[in-house]
Swiss-Prot record:
Pfam families per UniProt: dsrm (PF00035), Ribonucleas_3_3 (PF14622)
EC class (word): hydrolase
Compartmental location: Cytoplasm
Catalytic activity entry: Endonucleolytic cleavage to 5'-phosphomonoester
GO cellular component terms given for this protein: cytoplasm
Gene name as annotated: rnc
Organism whose genome encodes this protein: Streptococcus thermophilus (strain ATCC BAA-250 / LMG 18311)
SUPFAM superfamilies: dsRNA-binding domain-like, RNase III domain-like
GO molecular function: double-stranded RNA binding; metal ion binding; ribonuclease III activity; rRNA binding
Protein name per the record: Ribonuclease 3
UniProt main location, coarse: cytoplasm
Superkingdom of the organism of origin: Bacteria
Amino acid sequence: MFKKKGCFMNQLEQKLEQDFGIVFSQKDLLETAFTHTSYANEHRLLNISHNERLEFLGDAALQLVISVYLYNRYPNKPEGEMSKMRSTIVREESLAGFTKACGFEQYIRLGKGEEKSGGRERATILGDLWEAFLGALYLDQGLPAVEKFLNQVMIPQVEKGNFDRVIDYKTALQERLQVNGKVDITYTVIDESGPAHAKEFTMQVAVDGKELSTGLGKSKKLAEQAAAKSALEQLGN
């Protein structure tokens, strides 16, 4: 999206400072965090680093911070329940949702092929970006900075019960169903109820013309997400 390195870095640094109060000392870490392997591979002669190693580190930092949060927040929950909660919070689709909620997806550097194939919207890439950013933040400023950022962005959504709103279930369902080839996924309103100011929609999701699941929502978009979520649950996601 950004053709010039200076433009990409300047706008990213400005956003981080304005939106989150984060200022990186080691600019190279930030640049690496937002560089996908496809971009690095297309510029091999420049010896550009990609974000996979930072992703590995960020995953560990994320797991630790969320584990501590759950341990303190739910003193009476057994280990098994906390593990399930953590898995839901750090799942790929939710991390991709937080990446988009923060507007980070527009700054990732992708190879031309990856860009053309829709990589900027791919949950796998966006989830990896989130972890890579956390890894870079950890190396630059330590675990307290990672914890502060997550408490600012992720934890409030869990506390408010708005967590599902961050997860893009439609994208997750599409990627799940298209693993073995392209399929036709359609969403159709099959029922509307309630007064004009408080309507509720029933949405059907179908795959290649066959109904897979339905979902309810106070808007068509929310109903689509609910239908996709229900479909994923049926598929055992």
